[in-house]
Amino acid sequence: MKKVIKIIGIVILCIVALLAILLVCISKMSELKKDYNKKIETGGDIEAKYLCDGAHEVSYYEEAAAQAFEKYEIYYPKELETEDKVYPVIVVCNGTGWKASKSKSIYEHYASWRFIVIATEETHSWNAFGAEMCIVHLQRLNNNKVINDKDNIFYQKIDFDNVGIIGHSQGGVGVI
């Protein structure tokens, strides 16, 4: 009987170890592929148009963030650096275990259509606290001409009258 219990224990331990390895591998998996939007088939002209990248070159900015957010990742149209305009915003709520850095290509896609996109590395955005902190961070960027002793390219260029929020999986709950 002891031998059977020992064997069952070893089998359970092996299963748990394999599941742990599988979860680690999944969390390290590559994200959305760069050309994801070219592989989607659609029957509509409007969908086809907006599946393609927009006309604007995209730039990237990041800044360290507190707690589990790790960093604020901001994708924006490069013209923002030289133009005196305001730009609409998309705030991202990540799904469970999914960091913003795994979805770069979709954020670059949105920015190519002239949106500022902000996300974090938070992996549990069910309560939208990360989204709230993104808005606070954008307000800081919008209201300060100089940040960390450098000219701030986002100064007075964020359109807070046109802010959208997106999320997938658990991040969808944060959107609500």
Language-model region placement:
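Hydrophobic alpha-helical membrane-insertion segments, chiefly the h-region
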Residues: 16-28
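N-terminal cap/lid segment of alpha/beta-hydrolase-fold proteins
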Residues: 29-85
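Extracytoplasmic/secreted proteins, especially bacterial periplasmic and envelope-associated proteins
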Residues: 73, 88, 105, 112, ...
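N-terminal Sec-pathway targeting helices
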Residues: 1-17
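Solvent-exposed loop/turn segments at secondary-structure junctions
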Residues: 80, 95-99, 117, 122-127, ...
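Short beta-strand element of the alpha/beta-hydrolase
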Residues: 84-95
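Gly/Ser-rich "nucleophile elbow"/oxyanion-hole loop immediately N-terminal to the catalytic nucleophile
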Residues: 81-85, 129-173
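Short amphipathic alpha-helix adjacent to the substrate-entry channel of hydrolases
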Residues: 101-120
